[in-house]
């Protein structure tokens, strides 16, 4: 169904995630060629901080400034809001200032993570 990037020896790019998740770009459409190697899906930012290493994409239904701050601390390049969630303009500006792409999809978390996994994107190692 989806291209298997890892089998072809290619990294996925943010623009590929947009197609896979039928997502809308919220901010930083100038960074859509950014490569991503791993992903994490969680609504608990404490879990992201405790168990995630070197992730590139964060999928979440949580919409508050803590999401951007957590993503920044974990050196993530892209935040995907699931279940049709939309951040406020203040949160969007926070991400823009930190060079983070924000996307939104109507898909649920489980479906979004599954589609990205099917396309070859994997989760990172836990501590």
Predicted ranges, named:
Residues 33-34, 38, 42-57, 61-127:
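Feature captures the catalytic cores and cofactor-binding loops of soluble hydro-lyases/lyases
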